[in-house]
A protein has these predicted regions:
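Eukaryotic scaffold repeat domains enriched in small/polar residues
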Residues: 19-405
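Bacterial N-terminal signal peptides
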Residues: 6-15
Length: 405
């Protein structure tokens, strides 16, 4: 009996120790981050992505073209009102909320996203990454866009190319077998710096290029080869029963990230699903995020989406800052939440926030990032137009930079 009791006590101790090792993160919003007002009467617009660098600086990709006429009165000559002017496209903040650098925007370079396109929203700046050397990489999601690499101060270093013709040229039809151009621009990419590779999600596939822009490999949903990906429109998403059992990716693929154990996580927004692969494209696992949410709506990102968002649940993700990255945080711009899932099992563990305009709430959350102390940063598009900071309240105080940064 005493042996059984001892074994039971040991098992309970191990369970408690494991729970204490990676407790569910608890956050509180910092309503005073970033520090306001910004200089020059600047105002932040839609924020599709943000990233933290090796110094825990937060790089925000802002969409100046999203500004409304009643917001930019100070930009006219003479000024109509005291405020405001759209902030530049690239904003660097420290963890205290101080603005450190700012640059970029429409016309900044010949290859800047959505060059010559005036309309706001989807046809604009879309992704930002910062490498270990401090270089800033930016892509856009309009016809003819690509990736450009800059110094931290905004000097153009390199252009990825692989551009389709810009409007008014007709947009090329979907072709998941060709790897030369990106007809709809480049929504999202990530950098494997050790291998010097660029991972791009596009249409129904993941494509990998080297740092010279040469294609290396690619795959579709569940790791199928590019040759087996269909080029047909994706069927409607059915929320009446279980999640759809679909092998192919369902656009939009809205992010790609690497975990600490070298796996590739793909945000399949069209199926409310995360698919996980090895870096060679072998399928590992998948899990759904609030699968009853409508997705694949034709008006996603368009005029009707203000009335009924049909974009799905997975806009972006980041991983918890514990050594094993036990949790994955998923930004859901349709339900306006951050879902917390167990990274390895895919099980739902909790959530942060809800719909609203107050601090700690969201309207169309699109961007999410984490620093080495486990604090979260978020950005919102549509009329949300802001960034927020959420402070980890139950961390161990250890600094853990992202392994690939």
């Amino acid at each position: 009996m005493s042996t059984r009791i001892a074994l039971l006590a040991l098992a309970l101790f191990a369970a408690v120790a494991q729970a204490q090792k990676s407790p569910l993160p608890v956050y509180k919003v910092d309503p005073f981050w970033p520090k306001m007002p910004l200089p020059n009467k600047w105002i932040i617009q839609g924020v599709p992505t943000m990233v933290t660098d090796k110094d825990d600086h937060i790089w925000v990709l802002n969409r100046p073209r999203d500004i409304n006429p009643d917001e930019n009165g100070a930009a006219t000559k003479p000024p109509r009102t005291d405020c405001c002017i759209a902030a530049p496209a690239v904003l660097e903040f420290d963890t205290a909320g101080n603005l450190l650098k700012s640059w970029g925007g429409p016309g900044y370079t010949d290859g800047w996203p959505a060059q010559g396109i005036a309309r706001p929203g989807a046809a604009a700046e879309h992704n930002i990454m910062v490498d270990r050397e401090g270089n800033v990489w930016i892509s856009g999601s309009s016809q003819g866009d690509s990736i450009q690499k800059f110094t931290a101060d905004g000097k153009l270093l390199w252009d990825f190319g692989h551009r389709a013709a810009r409007p008014p040229a007709a947009r090329l039809p979907e072709n998941n077998q060709q790897t030369e151009v990106f007809p709809g621009g480049i929504f999202f990419f990530d950098l494997d710096e050790d291998a010097r590779e660029i991972y791009i999600v596009d249409a129904k596939r993941v494509l990998v290029y080297d740092y010279d822009g040469k294609f290396k490999r690619g795959w579709g949903g569940h790791g199928i080869p590019l040759s087996e990906i269909d080029n047909n429109p994706t069927p409607p998403y059915d929320t009446s029963g279980n999640p759809p059992d679909q092998i192919q990716f369902a656009p939009a693929l809205h992010c790609v990230h690497f975990s600490v154990d070298g796996l590739v996580y793909v945000c399949e927004r069209g199926s409310n699903r995360v698919q996980v692969f090895t870096k060679q494209g072998k399928f590992v696992s998948s899990f759904f995020v609030h699968p009853s949410t409508p997705s694949r709506g034709p008006e996603c990102g368009g005029p009707g989406s203000q009335l009924y968002g049909m974009c799905g649940t997975i806009y972006n993700l980041t991983f918890s800052h514990d050594a094993d990255e036990k949790y994955v945080f998923l930004a859901d711009g349709t339900n306006d939440k951050i879902w917390i899932h167990d990274r390895k099992t895919g099980a739902l563990a909790g959530s942060i926030g809800d719909n609203g305009r107050m601090a700690g709430q969201f309207h169309w959350i699109d961007a999410i990032a984490i620093d080495s102390r486990g604090n979260l940063y978020t950005g919102e598009v549509d009329t949300g137009k802001r960034v927020q900071k959420f402070i980890l309240t139950n961390g161990d105080g250890k600094l853990r930079p992202r392994p690939h940064e």
